[in-house]
């Protein structure tokens, strides 16, 4: 917002500024626009309110000026009058219904503005019209916050007298008194304290009044707070005390006051830093540091990372402060948790003068730091040649010759070729840093240029990787091996080919601009190119492969260095072979995968065949499409790459990949390549077209594009499912609408006869279902829409529990309930525990449906019992479901629950529904027989708990087996005990002549043997029983009739001791539906 010239304003505004009432009246009589707006949407009334001329203001209002007009920042004339302290103008505006609660863009009301601008009279006029004086602006500040911020004692007093809250916090939890302390408004602070303000209040980050006063150097406020007895060492959320803050901000007077009042000079914060650490690092902390040292601060106190105050001074090269610390006993070679001493830190940040001071005071230049590096490693790594020279001391080596060795030893006391823990010497670091002056200093000091690190890399590898031309030339000239491979088989040429990627990130000053980056980047690329060119000119072999089979051409392609790639292709004798080779991956694939369109263009212009495939059958075009690189797709298609080549696993083409990933632009390019008329309908291994994949992944733009380009909307995959089926599953309304707009057939069926309406119902997509039903009416209103198993959409909605879809289907065609499979929607709902849809069906269609039967004669109550659905059972019985109804096998819901071991359902049917436990099925099994046959002990005990009837306990089925036989055979000890205690007979024999005791035998032969043994034991059973028992035994005994086959049971099964013994009681397995 600039300053506007008065001469550029409308005549009415000029007259107002000139306070010329008659001119204003004259202009208004001439029909001058009274609500004319300037560039910031301010009206003449804003101007009059700002000037405060009541006569003009009233004239404008009476002439129809909008009293609540807002400018671009939503300020009204009332805001303007309050800001200018024009109380008469404000009174007049209020008299003419100006909105006293109007807010500007910062949510500030006229009260906020008046309080901030010391307009006491205006505030007195506004307050009676407000419900509260504690209304907050967007930052959470009240009028009292603004008044305190302005330091106006009279305004503060007025607001307090009118009920302003002392403890109201803004959005950073700062109270008005925080601002008084921070801005040094001592009298205001005293008033607030006298009115009861909390002098120990904290904001959201834990800052107290003492912290804020210390930060801004408000010495008088600090003294007053200390006199009030505030806690001097109270930490904020970061553990910093007021002394920490004062030292960090360089407020030496405040720091002095705090120290004199007894502040702890050695109190650490959350990271272990003391005030001395802060004083050592801050811009203006020199006097604070001296004060702390003179008052007993521990100069060797280490933070949680092991940094001493001397480390902190070394970061920013605080020379004078480092001298003070050293003179006061700071440990020169104190190491942090990484092993770095202050000398390492000074070398890392290039502070030569500080290095001199540290070395003069005995700092160990051979001390190992991070990764076992010397300070010299760090100095040369970051390219500080002056520091390098200083650390090399005299810069000259002398030889110590003995009978055992002939080593170069530095005068500083360490071997210059000593490696770090990764095997890298100082020369490696210098080569990586790229400062040729450092490199020359080390070489002249005897550094070994052939030394390899743990990765097998020489300094030349590092120089090449960083694209450092001068360092590369220096090392090669000095005799470095140009084709030496590292542990991965990479030569310096491999790294040079990808040098722009491997280049170490350099530090820039904080005020660097983006405009400086482009020339710098261009300069680096040129240097990297010259480096590569130099290596090639000096014998580097471009045909050498690393251990994975990649040449320098592969590296250049993978990292997108077009100039490097062109140079390598030009210099390589077998370049075409390298480019076309797909072992392990071709350069074309690498460039496409990484989205390097310039490199890709170079390769495309070199190659004849762009459709070479990798081991998975993917072409470069497929990879570019899959990765969403439209530029690469454009390059490849313009050079003739095919969009129809399929990869091996799913048989996807680039079109499939583009559609599945939603890469619309790439898809457009592929279609426009015009390889085939039906290119959009190409199918994968499952028969899916790109349209189907686009819809499955909800890519609407791709769907529209494919349909516009001729993709067949009704194309079906190998399971007969179309794009419309997929749209119904995903629920994408836009995709579905696009398909219907292109005449997709709504009632198309898959291999199971299911339509998209079935899928929408099953997935619960209400709006999709509504759209499909409407479309189906116009297609074939008589189609019953049942699948090949007879299930309708209503079956699926009920089974899946989608109430809204079921409601729509019932509204659409309530008679659909009776169509299709007799296993009704109600059966489906209760068997899947969908009580809400079950209740909806009963309420909509009446109680008559609760006793409907499926093909096996089973009612919904059978289904609920099978699923152990108690709520379903309750619902059905509430609507007169028949509790003892039987299916075609003669089984009741209780029998169904017993057979499947559903204890809760059995308990409910027995105790609540009073189900009949004596009902027999077609094989004369009771519920007790069925529970025992499947080993459901709890169910059997529940049934036994309801009866003492010997007729039921000793009831035999068509195989003459009692519950005791079956319980014994299945090892149900507690059930056997319960049966025996209720009088179950132990001598009854089944069809095979076996008693319950013999039923415990693992197989028939064992049972027969056990029977023979028992027959010879005393006491004997009654004579009749013996003869009957012996007859049956001999008839079936394996000894007496080895070749006799076991007779069939009444239900057609074989011997009850066969592998599937449960068939002896005529069960038909689990509930098949």
UniProtKB/Swiss-Prot annotation:
This is Serine/threonine-protein phosphatase 6 regulatory ankyrin repeat subunit C. Keywords: ANK repeat, Repeat. The gene is ANKRD52. GO terms for cellular component: cilium. GO terms for biological process: protein localization to ciliary inversin compartment. InterPro entries: Ankyrin_rpt (IPR002110), Ankyrin_rpt-contain_sf (IPR036770). The keyword Isomerase does not apply. The lineage of its organism: Eukaryota, Metazoa, Chordata, Craniata, Vertebrata. SMART domains: ANK. Protein phosphatase 6 (PP6) holoenzyme is proposed to be a heterotrimeric complex formed by the catalytic subunit, a SAPS domain-containing subunit (PP6R) and an ankyrin repeat-domain containing regulatory subunit (ARS). ANK repeats lie at residues 7-36, 40-69, 73-102, 106-135, 139-168, 172-201, 205-234, 238-267, 271-301, 305-334, 338-367, 371-400, 422-451, 455-484, 488-544, 548-578, 583-612, 616-645, 650-679, 686-715, 719-748, 752-781, 789-818, 821-851, 856-885, 889-919, 923-952, 959-988. Putative regulatory subunit of protein phosphatase 6 (PP6) that may be involved in the recognition of phosphoprotein substrates.
């Amino acid at each position: 917002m600039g300053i506007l010239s008065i001469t550029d304003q409308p005549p009415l505004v000029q007259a107002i500024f000139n306070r010329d009432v008659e001119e204003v009246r004259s202009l208004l009589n001439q029909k001058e626009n009274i609500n004319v707006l300037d560039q910031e949407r301010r009206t003449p009334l804003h101007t009059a309110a700002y000037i405060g001329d009541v006569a003009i203001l009233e004239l404008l209002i009476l002439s129809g000026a909008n009293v609540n007009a807002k400018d671009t920042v939503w300020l009204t004339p009332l805001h303007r009058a309050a800001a200018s302290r024009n109380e008469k103008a404000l009174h007049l505006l209020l008299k003419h219904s100006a909105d006293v609660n109007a807010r500007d863009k910062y949510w500030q009301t006229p009260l906020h503005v008046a309080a901030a601008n010391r307009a006491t009279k205006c505030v007195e006029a506004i307050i009676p019209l407000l419900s509260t004086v504690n209304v907050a602006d967007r930052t959470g500040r009240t009028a009292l916050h603004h008044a305190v911020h302005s330091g106006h004692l009279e305004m503060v007093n007025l607001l307090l007298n009118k009920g302003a809250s002392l403890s109201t916090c803004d959005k950073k939890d700062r109270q008005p008194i925080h601002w008084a302390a921070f801005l040094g408004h001592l009298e205001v602070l005293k008033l607030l304290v006298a009115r009861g303000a909390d002098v120990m209040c904290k904001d959201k980050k834990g800052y107290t009044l003492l912290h804020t006063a210390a930060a801004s150097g408000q010495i008088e406020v600090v003294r007053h707070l200390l006199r009030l007895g505030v806690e001097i060492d109270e930490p904020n959320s970061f553990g910093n005390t007021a002394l920490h803050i004062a030292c960090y901000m360089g407020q030496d007077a405040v720091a002095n006051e705090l120290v004199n009042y007894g502040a702890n000079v050695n109190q650490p914060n959350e990271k272990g830093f003391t005030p001395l650490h802060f004083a050592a690092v801050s811009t203006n902390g020199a006097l604070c540091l001296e004060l702390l040292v003179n008052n007993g601060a521990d100069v060797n106190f280490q933070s949680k990372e092991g940094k001493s105050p001397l480390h902190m001074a070394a970061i920013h090269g605080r020379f004078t402060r480092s001298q003070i610390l050293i003179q006061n006993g700071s440990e020169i070679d104190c190491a942090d948790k990484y092993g770095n001493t202050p000398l390492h830190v000074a070398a890392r940040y290039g502070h030569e003068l500080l290095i001199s001071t540290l070395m003069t005071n005995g700092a160990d230049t051979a001390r190992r730091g991070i990764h076992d590096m010397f300070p010299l490693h760090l100095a040369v790594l970051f390219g500080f040649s002056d520091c390098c020279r200083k650390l090399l001391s005299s810069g000259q080596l002398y030889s110590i010759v003995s009978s055992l060795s002939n080593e170069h030893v530095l005068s500083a006391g360490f071997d210059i070729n000593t490696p770090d823990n990764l095997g890298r010497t100082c020369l490696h670091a210098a080569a990586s840093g790229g400062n040729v002056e450092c490199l020359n200093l080390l070489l002249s000091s005897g550094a070994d240029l052939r030394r390899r690190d743990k990765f097998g890399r020489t300094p030349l590898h590092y120089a090449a990787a960083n694209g450092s031309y001068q360092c590369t030339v220096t090392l090669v000239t000095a005799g470095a091996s140009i084709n030496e491979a590292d542990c991965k088989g990479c030569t310096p040429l491999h790294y040079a080919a990808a040098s722009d990627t491997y280049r170490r990130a350099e530090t820039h000053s904080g005020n660097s601009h983006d405009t400086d980056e482009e020339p710098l980047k261009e300069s680096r690329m040129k240097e990297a190119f010259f480096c590569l060119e130099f290596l090639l000119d000096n014998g580097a072999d471009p045909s050498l492969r690393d251990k994975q089979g990649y040449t320098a051409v592969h590296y250049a392609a993978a990292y997108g260095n077009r100039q490097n790639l062109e140079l390598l292709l030009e210099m390589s004798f077998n370049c075409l072979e390298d480019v076309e080779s797909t072992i392990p991956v071709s350069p074309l694939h690498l460039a496409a995968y990484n989205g390097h369109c310039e490199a890709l263009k170079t390769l495309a212009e070199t190659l004849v065949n762009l459709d070479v495939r990798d081991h998975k059958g993917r072409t470069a075009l497929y990879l570019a499409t899959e990765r969403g690189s439209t530029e690469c797709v454009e390059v490849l298609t313009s050079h003739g790459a095919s969009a129809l080549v399929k990869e091996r696993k799913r048989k996807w083409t680039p079109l499939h990949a583009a559609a599945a990933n939603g890469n619309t632009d790439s898809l457009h390019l592929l279609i426009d390549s015009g390889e085939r008329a039906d290119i959009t309908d190409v199918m994968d291994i499952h028969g899916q077209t790109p349209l189907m994949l686009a819809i499955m992944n909800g890519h609407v733009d791709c769907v529209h594009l494919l349909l516009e380009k001729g993709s067949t909307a009704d194309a079906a995959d190998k399971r007969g499912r179309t794009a419309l089926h997929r749209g119904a599953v995903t629920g994408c309304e836009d995709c579905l609408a696009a398909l219907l707009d292109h005449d997709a057939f709504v009632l198309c069926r898959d291999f199971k006869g299911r339509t998209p309406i079935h899928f929408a119902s099953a997935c619960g997509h209400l709006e999709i279902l509504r759209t499909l039903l409407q479309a189906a009416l116009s297609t074939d209103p008589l189609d019953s829409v049942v699948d090949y198993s007879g299930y309708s959409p209503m079956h699926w909605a009920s089974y899946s529990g989608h109430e809204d879809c079921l409601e729509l289907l019932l509204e659409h065609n309530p008679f659909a309930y009776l169509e299709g499979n007799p296993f009704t929607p109600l059966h489906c709902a209760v068997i899947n525990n969908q009580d809400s849809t079950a209740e909806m069906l009963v309420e909509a269609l009446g109680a008559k449906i609760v006793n409907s039967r499926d093909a096996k004669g089973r009612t919904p109550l059978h289904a609920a019992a099978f699923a152990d659905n108690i709520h379903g059972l309750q619902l059905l019985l509430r609507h007169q479901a028949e509790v003892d109804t039987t299916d075609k096998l003669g089984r009741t819901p209780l029998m169904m629950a017993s057979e499947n071991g559903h204890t809760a359902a059995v308990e409910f049917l027995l105790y609540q529904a009073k189900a009949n436990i004596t009902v027999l099925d077609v094989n004369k099994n009771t519920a007790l027989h069925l529970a025992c046959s499947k080993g459901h002990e709890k169910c059997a005990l529940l049934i036994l708990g309801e009866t003492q009837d010997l007729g039921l306990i000793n009831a035999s089925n068509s195989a003459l087996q009692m519950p005791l036989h079956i319980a014994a055979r299945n090892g149900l000890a507690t059930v056997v005990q319960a049966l025996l205690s209720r009088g179950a007979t132990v001598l009854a024999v089944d069809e095979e002549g076996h008693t319950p005791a013999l039923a415990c035998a693992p197989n028939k032969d064992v049972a027969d043997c056990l029977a023979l043994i028992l027959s010879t034991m005393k006491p004997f059973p009654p004579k009749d029983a013996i003869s009957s028992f012996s007859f049956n035994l001999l008839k079936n005994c394996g000894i007496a009739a080895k070749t006799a086959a076991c007779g069939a049971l009444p239900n057609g099964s074989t011997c009850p001791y066969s592998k599937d013994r449960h068939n002896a009681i005529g069960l038909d397995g689990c509930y098949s539906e």
